[in-house]
A protein has these predicted regions:
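C-terminal (or distal) subdomains of carbohydrate-active enzymes
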Residues: 65-69, 76, 80-471
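Metal- or metallocofactor-binding catalytic centers and their adjacent structured scaffolds
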Residues: 1-91, 402, 406-409
Length: 471
């Protein structure tokens, strides 16, 4: 569902950009309308939460495949149309940013090059298996930037890595982190803040498995008693260093979770505070709940949760009956726990269940109900969640942008030298001068009369903002 929503938004943005630049591209209104209709159909109240019959999900998976394939074609056609007109004096990469924020982000593109620059300055990059991975800096909002290829620079590791009793101690420009052999974080020193994030004796990225047997309505309900029935996870685990390049330091974890097998890539970046946990799991359980827990040394009685076009604060205690009933709550891209001056967010790209209590951020990863579908959620799953320690609260800490960045990777296209191109090397279709105003949607009006922009104020504060339109 999340992937379809963002694919629709990206396709709309790309198509609107290509047509508005008078490239000869025609906005595919009918196809986009169909993609949104199918997305909304699959948000029916039994399909979306996983409480429908198994046969329903056979159709649903097929329809999601149609949505994603159609959006990919639209996006690819639109961006290739634009990229072919960007004026360049040598080969390189045009990176498109579909978000309403300017950003620095990691991109990967298949090409034969081994180096890349920005205004003559070499960018951190890494080559592997015919692909170039680099940090695209200063990407304009709702636009693109061209990065020319260059000769390879020596690849300097971004982290100092030391083996430590089956795990690793990793020093990056931002963090000093200790991982045990299960991929859990036993210590995290934030160098800029000068503080330890993980409480002594506890572990972050702790995978927790609970018994999950509701009194009734197996796929619908989660009972609060589940917390009293936790299973020990003592399966084999193996942690190795997969990459230590100028772009990132990546650990590779293979671990048994009861009868299931988990593979996880844990990635730290020198340019970003985000720590990613890209997860693949072959799920073979019944009547259990899997969560990822992140205890943090942060004192706050309220947590902030991302919702549609905003966020909402909820208590982290159970002093009232209604707070006690919120032992599990819904959120979209992130949940954040902050005290004055510092905080931590737990981001995701497609999980919706959170609980934040007693200084622990937890994200529900998978369940294993057997009614009405006896095979619900069995098989392969791929998702990413991320920890984002930050200065300030969720507003000053860039949590909103980080949530969008995780869910909407930038889009790179390799191009040849195009000296006859008519479009600039860097371009922003729309820009906003207020960090709390989010431009989420750019689409063609349903009657074809112009473009529609959907913006929202994200901090809950009065704001005066200027929207810069294209020339």
């Amino acid at each position: 569902n999340r992937a379809a929503e963002f694919a629709n938004l990206t396709a709309e943005t790309a198509a609107a950009l290509a047509e508005s630049l008078r490239t000869g591209y025609a906005y595919p209104a009918a196809a986009l309308h169909r993609n949104w209709e199918l997305t909304l159909l699959n948000q029916f109240h039994d399909i979306l939460p996983g409480s429908a019959l198994g046969e329903v999900y056979e159709v649903s998976q097929q329809q999601y495949g149609e949505i994603l394939a159609s959006d990919a074609r639209i996006t690819d056609d639109a961006l290739h149309t634009v990229a072919a007109l960007v004026k360049t004096d040598r080969p390189g990469v045009v990176v498109f940013n579909q978000l309403g924020f300017a950003r620095d982000t990691v991109v990967r593109v298949a090409c034969g090059a081994s180096g890349i620059t920005d205004d003559g300055h070499p960018l951190p990059c890494h080559t592997e298996n015919g692909a170039l991975t680099f940090v695209a800096k200063d990407l304009p909002a709702k636009g693109w930037r061209f990065y020319p290829f260059a000769d390879a620079e020596p690849e300097t590791p971004c982290a100092e890595v030391t083996e430590n009793d089956g795990g690793y101690i990793i020093d990056t420009p931002l963090y000093h982190i200790v991982f045990n052999g299960c991929g859990e974080i036993t210590a995290l020193l934030d160098k800029e803040a000068g503080r330890e994030l993980i409480p002594a004796g506890q572990c972050a990225n702790e995978l927790q498995l609970f018994e999950d047997r509701p009194d009734e309505y197996d796929a619908w309900n989660l009972e609060k008693y589940y917390r009293r029935h936790r299973f020990a996870l003592d399966g084999a685990a193996r942690l190795t260093v997969a990459e230590n390049s100028p772009v990132c330091c990546r650990l590779h974890l293979e671990r048994a979770i009861s009868r299931s097998q988990l593979v996880q890539d844990i990635t730290l970046y020198p340019h970003s505070r985000r720590i990613d946990f890209a997860t693949h799991i072959d799920w073979r359980e019944q009547h259990v709940l899997l969560k990822a827990a992140f205890p943090v040394d942060i004192c706050a009685d309220r947590a902030q949760y991302d919702i549609q076009f905003g966020s909402i604060a909820r208590d982290t205690h159970t002093n009232t009956s209604w707070d006690e009933a919120r032992f599990e709550v819904c959120a979209h891209k992130w949940a954040d726990l902050s005290e004055p001056g510092y905080g931590a967010a737990l981001l995701n790209d497609g999980r919706y269940g959170y609980d934040v209590h007693d200084g622990v951020l937890r994200l529900s990863l998978l369940r294993a109900a057997t009614y009405p579908d006896p095979h619900a959620d069995q098989g392969a799953h791929d998702f990413t969640y991320a920890l984002l320690p930050h200065l300030g609260d969720w507003r000053q800490g860039g949590v909103i942008l980080a949530g969008y960045d995780l869910n909407a990777p930038a889009l790179p296209l390799a191009v040849a030298a195009q000296p006859a191109g008519t479009l600039p090397a860097a371009y922003s279709q729309f820009r906003i001068d207020a960090p709390n105003v989010v431009l989420e949607t750019v689409k063609k009006a349903e009657d074809g009369s112009g473009l529609i922009l959907r913006l929202y104020e994200s901090w809950g504060t009065r704001t005066r903002a200027a929207l810069a339109l294209p020339d």
